[in-house]
Amino acid sequence: MTYTRDYHNREFEAFSRAELASGGPDPQVKIIAEAITRLGGSDVEKTWRAGAFISAYTCGAAASIWAQLGWEDSSEMISAFLRMHGEYLPTRRERRTIWGADRVKWTKNLVSWSALAARVAEWKDLAYPALYDTISKNTTYFGRYATMKVIEVLHRAGVVAAGQTDIRPIGAKYPRRTLAWLFGYDIGTIDSDRNDDMALATVNAIAEDLKLKYAIESWFDFETLLCNYRQSLRGKYPGRSHDRELAHWRKAEPYWRPETQARWIPFYEIRAQLFPHEFLGEIGGWSGARPELEAALTRRHKGVVQHDTLIKKEREHGA
């Protein structure tokens, strides 16, 4: 069985509306931007905090790093801190690029970011393409999504003027493939090897109709929804990001003490303020991802996972 453009459009719309209603698609970005705004400080400090969060993708790690390290700290201090405490700094699998018991990659990442943060006055007013290039070229172990994500945090926190303005084609294989599903294109028609004007125009012309159709406010949210929809075919239910983040936060709490964590990121307070309470495990009584919801969504899309050629290839290669 081949799943059609109509099927994917219907399911993408249903998933996107539910994910947006939950406060997604990337609620951690909103939490961190709010926490940075509340803490105040200079643009350098705000920028450092944004990148420290991106290094691990969890609020629990961010609060701990913010409490113990600053942008002026030496690489030796950063390395010593990470080697001593890294086990209790939860990181998402998406940031496995900085994993390693010696913490060398994580140290390089934070050192490179602190150097860039110190010069934020030089680049904070750049237009999005130049801003993206500046961050991606000057930060070690920041890939495509990490660069997009830190720009979104800085934009929401009022540090940089530019938010995301397009879907950079290069490296965007998952959102690009979802666009191919939604429009019935072969993925080869959406170029993946360059970010020149023609490639950008092709991808963005395809995307703009959907972005407007579903009233999605930002390009960052739109691209994240494209990726999340693909993951929903394998069980990523609307609101799962909230559940995973709660589990990460609670992993860090016993080691760092709840009152210390909350002084830097009032996690539960911000979540209760920003998001519908029915999606929050600390209110509803669960403490992490809910397997029963993952299983239900996987069953719903069982045919897609079994029969869609692209999904099958990605599963075979562990994507």
Show the residue positions of the predicted features.
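N-terminal polyanion-binding entry modules of DNA glycosylases/AP lyases
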Residues: M1-R93, H317
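Generic hydrophobic, helix-prone segments enriched in Leu/Val/Ile
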Residues: G51, D102-W113, V203, L225-C227, ...
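Generic structural signal for hydrophobic core residues of well-folded globular domains
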Residues: F53-T58, T139, L154, L179-F183
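Charged/polar, low-hydrophobicity segments characteristic of intrinsically disordered regions
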Residues: S79-T97, E208-T224
